[in-house]
Structure formats: structure tokens, C-alpha cells
Amino acid sequence: MPDKVTIAALQQMKRDGQKIAGVVAWDTPIAKIADLAGVDLASVGDSVGVNLWGHDDPLQVTMDEMLIVCKAVRRGTTRALVSCDLPYGPVQHSPKAAIAAAGRLMKDGGADMIKVDAAADFPDAVRALVEAGVPVFAQFGLTPQTAAKHGIPYSSQNSPNAQATAEAAEKLVEEARMLEQAGACMLDFTNSGPVAGAAVVKAVKIPVIGGFGGGPWLDGRVRLAHTAIGYADKWLDSKTDTYVNTAKAALGAFTALIADVRAGKQIKG
């Protein structure tokens, strides 16, 4: 892998059978640590609205907010390829609006690639973006914006395709091929079952990665950075396995800090 990850390098990884490792990052320190660890992809997600800002769904995240977050992650990376989500709105409005928004995220935000949520619903926008020179990371399946729009809980257990019937898998394969033909350089296969995931990977030449619900046959995985390190209050009582429980460590640190302040001791750091 070169010093700076490129789309071509990620596509070569698929051909070589090497898994792509990515994280969803929203701030400079986390992006910098993940980059130093050697992640291939830093994905700037509109999931920041739900996981960091307390919104009920990602539809409330604005273009200006995504630009700020994209800049923060870009400043934290030197090696990883940076992908940034188009927030809800531009793609739904028109291909022209999508191109303008993507241009801002690339020119001003420093994104290397633009992710389009529910891309299979907007093939004209995907084609227009590609023709305008925008590298498109096309997300399909049960995507966060689609789930929020229709009031569907966003988890693999609640996906209508989680058990991946043959009919569902066939439809998803058709969508994957359509997105590849539209010019997408990578696919984000989301929450739609391992059977369909395996079929999609075989059906297209471009990398197919996913967060959960896609099975081990995907060309790579992308994980929320804050989930990987257990960095949220929900991890205080959670028995879900993470690589480290930062929430419990932070609780202990803040408790010790408060005790030192109360006792008049010199605080650390």
C-alpha cells in the first residue's frame, strides 16, 4: 500500500483479495489516531448527527456542518483516503445540486471521494457526479437516510433484507451492477444480509465494503470509530464487545479529577 491511499489502490486490494479496513470518523484527534494505525479509509459520515450531536436521525445534518466535519477529519489524515457523505438534500433536489455540494466537500473540505446514500434510488445523480469528475462511493441496501426517512429502526436485526432471500439478493445484485455501470468507484453495502453480500461481491469488479449486516465475504469493513473504542455513554453499561471501553475509562478519569479538585490536590495533565 502506498504512503497515500488512492481509489486505484483500494480497487487493487479487491483484485488481490486483501480486505479494506475503514473507520467512520468525525474529528481530528480520532482521525489522526486511526490514520497512524494504518486504516485505509476514513469515512466522514452524517452519522455524526446521531452519534455525536444527539439528533434523532441523520436527516437533520446540514451541508455546512458536513463541511466542518470533513475539514476536521482531513486535517487528521495523511495516509488514509477520505470519503465524505453528501447530507440529505442535494441529491434529492437535483443532479446539479449534488454536483455543487460534492464540489464544496472536495474543494473546501478536502474529501477524496463522495458517498451518496441510497444511491440506487438516484442513478441519474450518480452518473452526473461521475461525469463531473466526482469519485462516487455509492451506498445501497437499508441505508441510514432511507431508514430515517421511512421511520425504520436502523439495525441489522430490523432490516427487511436481513435474512437475504434469493429475491432480495437478486434485486441488490441488480442495483450493484447498475451503480457500477453508472461509474461508482466503490460500493457501501449496508444492512442487507450476508447471502446478498456474497452475491454482490461476486457480481461487480469494484470494491464492496460495509459496516454490518453484510457478512464476511465483503471486500472490507468500515466501523464507527467511536463504537470501536467504546466512546459513548451507552457503553458504560453495555456488554457488547468493543476493542476498548473508553467510556468506562473516561468515567473513572472524571471521577478521579473531581475527587482531586474537591481535595485541593494538583490535577493531572
Describe the residue ranges of each PLM region.
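Alpha/beta enzyme core
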Residues: 2-269
